[in-house]
Structure formats: structure tokens, C-alpha cells
Amino acid sequence: MSKHRVRAPMRRILGIAATTVALLSPVVAVPAQAQAQPVTSAVQRVEWLSDRRVSMWVYSAAMNTPIQVQMLLARDWHARPDAKFPMLLMLDGLRAQDDENGWTKDADAEGFYADKNVNVVLPVGGQSSWYSDWLSPDNGHTYKWETFLTKELPPILERDWRTTDVRGVQGLSMGGTAAMNLAGRNPGLMKYVASYSGLLTTTTLGMPQAITFANKDAGGFDAAAMWGPPGGPEWAAHDPYLLAEKLRGVSMYVSSGSGLAGTHDQLSEMPLLSENWAGTGLEILARLSTENFVTKLEKLSIPVQANYRPSGTHTWPYWDFEMRQSWGQAAAALGTDPNGANCGLGGAIAGLAQAANWLGGCLSAEYPAATGVAQDFQHGRVFHSAATGTHAVAGRIGGTYAGVGGAASPLGLPTGDEVGLPDGRGRMQSFEGGSIYWTPETGAQVMRGAFLEEWGKQGYERGPAGYPVAAEAATPSRDGAVQAFEHGPMFYSATTGAHRVQGFVLDKYAQLGFENSPLGFPVAEEAPLKDLGRYSRFEGGNIYWSPLSGAWSVRNGALMEEWGKQGFENGRLGFPVSDEFAVPGGIQQNFQTGFIVVRDGKSEVHGV
């Protein structure tokens, strides 16, 4: 076929995946016919990072772009599959990054909330946005975060992610300001709001200038594109101090340090001061604005829990501390148990859990799972049945397993432990109905049925296909399936079985329309020909490739029969150099040293 490249271009593999609808995958593919952006907000892709942490890309109609949102699933998510849980939205700081929310990147929200019965929602990105709807686009972004977080995202979480309409929001610094604004500007939306070191007076003397400077420093954003010129109506509309009355009835928690060096700071040469000069100044601003905000609430007789620490700068360890300190109040407002899991170990699962201390503490008692039982732990789940034994499922493999439905899916219960593979690169785990394979580059992918059988015949990951890079998916045009691998996808139908197509032959197959073309599904593996050529057979014909001729299809019928009489590529005509095309009264196909014309069922061979 091609130059025997070690790896087929990833664009081909992704092109295949984009034409299909995922059947069994933690990553939801988008059909080719649905590539146009939806009119309304919708989830475009889901990736399970573990059995308790999910990343989804939600198309925001307001921002006309997909927004990554991560979720930390409630403690009882797996043990009580019919239950719904309150939502706790956690907002990032000014320098929010596009890869991960700071609450999991720089603090331990994932560990802390593992045994809490709340769905934690972590929007990713939004640097310098203050999570608000901007007046105009700026710096390549059309920020409409308030619309996204208050109108577009909640219905999706309630419909598809077992989340109730009982909501709370908390954030640090910029996110603390935004938390108060979202709650105040959207009465009734939030039951609980917390600000850790937030700027809670945005219009007082010097604050607009400070925010303007901060936005310019963090990403080069113009605050005038956000709220207009200082003193304008949008600044007042986004000032928690001025929104105080609208926060009546919301459970509130605010905190800040003093700016003096604390337990998480490195002392400077000046007594009591940290080397983190910027963090010192920012925390002093946060403290002053928080105190002013609390004074306003007291005048209005609106209750608030204020925690003023005698030390501490504007940095993550203190916000991690406040996250833990405020949980009891958050849990009460959200109507969930503030305590951790109440569970113990017993039976066959106990022995494994005690030996595998990496699992962490238990999060549930045993509960039914298919024909066996399961128990949840902080870093994975353990399954047991008399027929399959006792096995832990964790990490990215555990995430994929949970994403496809776990024990209730066609995979069934695990039949072995996760093991490393001989190449030192990948890992796999076997289940009743298939296996899951993982590498850092390809992620964790399910292998089952005809694809697993054919892949096994070819040597699994050691064979020519390499590792799977996507889940099995339905072919969009005909009854069949496709699964992408590092070196070309396999196509399957009930009549043809599973066969791989790769390289330039795959390019040609794609150009013709894959299985929806006259060629249909592949019926055999690619085979070598003379002059470094390759070919693949399909239901309706073949695709031939050589370095000099390129890749072309020859369809079954009179033209193929005549070329066969001439000896195929070994005959005087050589390899094809075109697909068949219509001519007056028939069809024609060109070859390296001639052409064949078929008219009225009669073939004519012409040399060059």
C-alpha cells in the first residue's frame, strides 16, 4: 500500500471517528452530518478520567464555542444509580487555565469531596473573565460566562447528570467575586455562596483600576470590554456590595487572610511579611473589601459567616483550607450529609482492599453489581462474584469502564486484575465481555467482539494495527461498525467480518465514501503486490496502490473481469491510474499502459 509507514496519520483515524456515532465509549463521537454547531447548548464530548471524575465539552450557544466542564461525582453515584445530588459549582481564580480547574490542579478538591454526596462542577478556562457576560469580544474571546453557568449548563446537568436544582457556588479571588455576583444577579438560583479572598466591593475607590490592571496583567484583557469604563452601570451591576440585598436568604460564607505571612508562606527579610509580595497586597485588598461587604450585610440584618484569619496571603493552600472549613455550612444549605462515608469491609472484598492500600478508604458498603457485588473506594472500585473472583478496577481503565456502564454494560464483571503489557507502554484489564487497553497516548479503549477477535489473531498490540485509539462505533450509512487503531481502522459487518484498512488505501476508501460507497465493507486484510504495491478487497471491488500509480479502485463487474484476463497488475496494462468513469455508451478505466472500455457489456482493451 503506502511506504509502510510506522503510523498512519492521525488525521485519517480521527476522520473515521468523526463519521460515526459511539456505541460503547467514554468519549462520545460526533457524526459527520452533525458537524455544524448546534443552535442550543449541548454536550459534544465526554471523557471519563476515573470512575468518579468526568470531563465534558459543552457547546455554549452564547459563546459559540465548546467549554470544558469537569465533574467530581457524588459519593453514592455508583451505589445508588437512581439517586440525584445537589450541585456545588467551584470557580477558579484570575489566571484560570484551559487544561484544568485550579481546585483540582492546585488544591485537593478531588480528594476532599470523594466522600461527600454532592456533584462538584468545575468549569475550565475563563482567564480574567470574572465569569460574567462581557459587553464586547476581547483578546479572541466572546465571554458570556454568566449565561453559560446560570442558563445553559444547569439544564444539561439536571437532565443528563443526575443533578438537582439545589445549587451552591464558591470561588477564590476572581471566582469569589463572581460567586457573589452570580448568586446576587440570579435570585433563587443558589442556596449557598462562598467567597475565599474575593474582591467584594468592585466600585469603591481604586478597585476598578486594580481590576483593570489585573486583567491586563493576566492574559492582556481589557476590562472596558467586560464592564465598560469605570463608573459605568455595568460596574455597579457587578458589585457584590451593591447586590447585598439580593443575597438575602442565601447561606453565605466569606473569608480572607490578613496579608501577613502564615503557615504556608516563606518569610521575607522583613518581619511578618512573606516573600510573595503580590500575594500580600492582593490579600490585603481582599480583606478590606470583604470587611466592607460584611459590614453592609450586618446593616441589612443579613446573616453571613465571616472567617478572618490573622495571617495568610493570596495563595492556594489557604483556599484549600477554607474549602474544608466551609463544607459544614455548604452541606447544610444544600441538604446533604456533612459527614464522610459510613462503611466497613467484609467478605471477599475485604481481603483485596486490605492488601491494596492504594485504593484508599471505602466510600460505600457492598451493593449489587450484575451477578456479583461491588464496593466503592476513594481511588477505585472492587467487584466480586463467585464466577469471576475479586478484582479492583481503577484509574483511566476504571473511568472507561464506568463510562460505558460498568458491570451492567456488555463488558460485565472484571475477570482479571489490571496488568502491564510486554512493551512496557500499555496496560490492560480483562472482563467477561471483552477487555480495556490503555496507553498514555491512546487513552483507555474497550475491545470486544469481532474486533477483539481479529485484533488478537493479528497479535494484539504487537500486531500491525497497534493499540486502539477510539471505541467501537456504528457506521453511519450501513449496518456495521468501525474501530480506529494507531495504524488504521477496522471495519465490521455481519457478512464480511472485521478487517483493517490503512494508509493510502484508507485515503482512497475515505474519498469514495467508506462503506457507503459502491465498494462496501472490506472483506480481507491488505495484501502485497509487485513493485511494492498493496491492495485491499471489498464487497464491491478492490483498491490498488503502488508508489508510481497511486491508489485507485477497481469495481467488480465486466471491467474487473477484463483486467483479470489481462493478468491484473502483472499483465500488460499494469496498475490502475484512475477510477472508472463514464464515457458515451459505457465506462472506462485507465491503467499505466492502456485503458479498458466497456460498452453494452462488451470490453475493449486499448494499449498506449
Language model region names:
Residues 2, 11-17, 24-340:
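Non-catalytic cap/lid and distal C-terminal segments of serine-dependent acyl enzymes
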Residues 10, 122, 166-167, 192, ...:
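A generic structural-conservation signal
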Residues 19-20, 348:
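Terminal low-complexity, poorly structured segments
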Residues 339-608:
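Extended, compositionally biased repeat/scaffold regions that form elongated interaction surfaces
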Residues 6-8:
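Short, Lys/Arg-rich cytosolic juxtamembrane segment immediately N-terminal
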